[in-house]
Amino acid sequence: LIQPRKDEDPTNINAVFTPQAGGINPMFAQWANRNYPLSMTGAVGLSCTMDKGYDVVPLVVSPVGSWTELETTDFEGEVPVFNPKAGEINQQLPVVLALTRQLNGKEQRILIFGDADWMTTGEFSKSRYYGVANGPLTTLMCSWMADYQYPTYFPRPAQPDNHLKLSYSHEGP
Protein backbone atom coordinates (compact mmCIF):
# COMPACT_ATOMS: atom_id res chain seq x y z
CA LEU A 1 0.00 0.00 0.00
CA ILE A 2 1.16 3.51 -0.70
CA GLN A 3 -0.05 6.97 0.23
CA PRO A 4 1.70 9.65 -1.81
CA ARG A 5 2.18 12.86 0.21
CA LYS A 6 4.51 15.79 -0.08
CA ASP A 7 7.82 15.28 1.76
CA GLU A 8 6.90 11.78 2.99
CA ASP A 9 7.84 8.26 1.94
CA PRO A 10 4.90 6.99 -0.14
CA THR A 11 5.27 3.51 1.37
CA ASN A 12 4.44 4.99 4.80
CA ILE A 13 0.67 5.16 5.23
CA ASN A 14 -1.27 6.86 7.99
CA ALA A 15 -3.89 4.17 8.53
CA VAL A 16 -7.12 5.13 10.31
CA PHE A 17 -9.16 3.45 13.03
CA THR A 18 -12.69 2.39 12.11
CA PRO A 19 -15.85 3.29 14.02
CA GLN A 20 -16.34 -0.47 14.60
CA ALA A 21 -13.03 -0.51 16.51
CA GLY A 22 -14.82 1.24 19.37
CA GLY A 23 -16.50 -2.09 20.14
CA ILE A 24 -13.05 -3.49 20.98
CA ASN A 25 -11.93 -0.49 23.05
CA PRO A 26 -13.66 2.91 23.51
CA MET A 27 -10.29 4.62 22.99
CA PHE A 28 -10.27 3.35 19.40
CA ALA A 29 -13.59 5.13 18.76
CA GLN A 30 -12.01 8.36 20.01
CA TRP A 31 -9.03 7.80 17.72
CA ALA A 32 -11.39 7.18 14.80
CA ASN A 33 -13.28 10.43 15.53
CA ARG A 34 -10.05 12.42 15.76
CA ASN A 35 -8.34 10.77 12.76
CA TYR A 36 -5.48 9.69 15.04
CA PRO A 37 -3.40 7.60 12.61
CA LEU A 38 -1.42 4.40 12.93
CA SER A 39 1.82 4.88 11.00
CA MET A 40 2.67 1.81 8.91
CA THR A 41 5.54 1.46 6.44
CA GLY A 42 5.28 -1.31 3.88
CA ALA A 43 1.79 -2.36 4.96
CA VAL A 44 -0.39 -4.72 2.95
CA GLY A 45 -4.17 -4.92 2.81
CA LEU A 46 -5.74 -7.92 4.51
CA SER A 47 -8.60 -10.07 3.28
CA CYS A 48 -10.51 -12.65 5.26
CA THR A 49 -13.38 -15.08 5.07
CA MET A 50 -16.24 -14.69 7.49
CA ASP A 51 -17.33 -18.34 7.67
CA LYS A 52 -14.69 -19.83 9.99
CA GLY A 53 -16.41 -19.19 13.33
CA TYR A 54 -14.68 -15.92 14.21
CA ASP A 55 -16.23 -12.52 14.70
CA VAL A 56 -14.04 -10.23 12.60
CA VAL A 57 -13.70 -6.49 13.19
CA PRO A 58 -11.68 -4.31 10.81
CA LEU A 59 -9.80 -2.35 13.46
CA VAL A 60 -7.66 -0.15 11.20
CA VAL A 61 -7.97 0.54 7.45
CA SER A 62 -5.77 2.18 4.85
CA PRO A 63 -6.46 5.90 4.41
CA VAL A 64 -8.53 7.44 1.64
CA GLY A 65 -6.22 8.21 -1.29
CA SER A 66 -3.99 5.19 -0.77
CA TRP A 67 -3.78 2.23 -3.12
CA THR A 68 -2.09 -1.10 -3.75
CA GLU A 69 0.92 -0.20 -5.88
CA LEU A 70 1.95 -2.98 -8.26
CA GLU A 71 4.20 -1.23 -10.77
CA THR A 72 6.55 1.18 -8.95
CA THR A 73 9.50 -0.45 -7.19
CA ASP A 74 11.93 2.48 -6.84
CA PHE A 75 10.03 4.92 -4.63
CA GLU A 76 13.01 7.28 -4.35
CA GLY A 77 13.50 7.63 -8.11
CA GLU A 78 9.95 7.21 -9.42
CA VAL A 79 6.64 8.87 -8.65
CA PRO A 80 3.93 6.23 -8.21
CA VAL A 81 0.81 6.72 -10.33
CA PHE A 82 -2.43 4.84 -9.74
CA ASN A 83 -3.09 2.40 -12.61
CA PRO A 84 -6.29 0.35 -12.35
CA LYS A 85 -5.41 -1.46 -15.61
CA ALA A 86 -2.45 -3.02 -13.78
CA GLY A 87 -4.80 -4.35 -11.09
CA GLU A 88 -4.07 -1.65 -8.53
CA ILE A 89 -6.88 -1.11 -6.01
CA ASN A 90 -7.78 2.38 -4.79
CA GLN A 91 -10.03 1.83 -1.79
CA GLN A 92 -9.77 1.58 1.96
CA LEU A 93 -8.49 -1.88 2.85
CA PRO A 94 -8.20 -3.48 6.30
CA VAL A 95 -4.64 -3.39 7.64
CA VAL A 96 -5.47 -4.59 11.18
CA LEU A 97 -8.13 -7.18 12.00
CA ALA A 98 -9.41 -8.19 15.44
CA LEU A 99 -10.82 -11.71 15.62
CA THR A 100 -12.73 -13.26 18.51
CA ARG A 101 -14.52 -16.55 19.11
CA GLN A 102 -15.72 -18.63 22.01
CA LEU A 103 -13.58 -21.70 22.62
CA ASN A 104 -14.10 -24.07 25.57
CA GLY A 105 -16.04 -21.42 27.49
CA LYS A 106 -13.41 -18.72 27.01
CA GLU A 107 -13.02 -15.94 24.48
CA GLN A 108 -10.08 -16.35 22.12
CA ARG A 109 -8.69 -13.02 20.85
CA ILE A 110 -6.44 -12.58 17.85
CA LEU A 111 -4.99 -9.46 16.21
CA ILE A 112 -3.64 -9.64 12.67
CA PHE A 113 -1.51 -6.79 11.30
CA GLY A 114 -0.63 -6.18 7.66
CA ASP A 115 2.70 -4.71 8.80
CA ALA A 116 5.23 -5.66 11.46
CA ASP A 117 7.23 -2.42 11.39
CA TRP A 118 4.56 -0.31 13.10
CA MET A 119 5.82 -1.57 16.48
CA THR A 120 9.58 -1.08 16.07
CA THR A 121 12.02 1.26 17.74
CA GLY A 122 12.59 2.89 14.35
CA GLU A 123 8.90 3.72 14.02
CA PHE A 124 8.62 4.92 17.63
CA SER A 125 11.64 7.21 17.27
CA LYS A 126 10.53 8.98 14.07
CA SER A 127 10.18 12.72 14.44
CA ARG A 128 6.82 13.96 13.14
CA TYR A 129 4.84 17.16 13.32
CA TYR A 130 1.70 15.12 14.13
CA GLY A 131 0.93 12.41 16.68
CA VAL A 132 0.46 8.74 15.86
CA ALA A 133 -1.18 5.86 17.74
CA ASN A 134 1.76 3.45 17.48
CA GLY A 135 2.95 3.73 21.09
CA PRO A 136 -0.45 3.83 22.81
CA LEU A 137 -1.76 1.00 20.61
CA THR A 138 0.99 -1.29 21.90
CA THR A 139 -0.28 -0.99 25.47
CA LEU A 140 -3.97 -1.15 24.56
CA MET A 141 -3.35 -4.17 22.33
CA CYS A 142 -1.70 -6.09 25.18
CA SER A 143 -4.44 -5.00 27.57
CA TRP A 144 -7.20 -6.24 25.22
CA MET A 145 -5.43 -9.54 24.60
CA ALA A 146 -5.25 -10.06 28.41
CA ASP A 147 -8.96 -9.20 28.86
CA TYR A 148 -8.00 -5.82 30.40
CA GLN A 149 -6.37 -7.52 33.40
CA TYR A 150 -2.88 -6.22 32.59
CA PRO A 151 -1.72 -3.54 32.39
CA THR A 152 -4.22 -1.84 34.65
CA TYR A 153 -6.94 -0.35 32.51
CA PHE A 154 -8.59 2.92 33.54
CA PRO A 155 -10.67 4.28 30.67
CA ARG A 156 -11.21 8.03 30.82
CA PRO A 157 -13.49 10.24 28.76
CA ALA A 158 -11.81 12.12 25.94
CA GLN A 159 -10.63 15.58 26.88
CA PRO A 160 -11.68 18.42 24.60
CA ASP A 161 -9.10 19.28 22.00
CA ASN A 162 -9.95 22.96 21.66
CA HIS A 163 -6.89 24.77 23.01
CA LEU A 164 -4.81 26.96 20.75
CA LYS A 165 -1.84 28.93 22.04
CA LEU A 166 -0.34 31.61 19.84
CA SER A 167 2.45 34.00 20.59
CA TYR A 168 3.94 36.88 18.70
CA SER A 169 7.21 38.65 19.02
CA HIS A 170 8.54 41.51 17.01
CA GLU A 171 12.03 42.91 16.94
CA GLY A 172 12.97 46.14 15.37
CA PRO A 173 11.82 49.76 15.25
Language-model segment annotations:
Residues L1-Y150:
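Acidic, S/T/G-rich, low-cysteine, solvent-exposed domains in lumenal/extracellular/periplasmic regions
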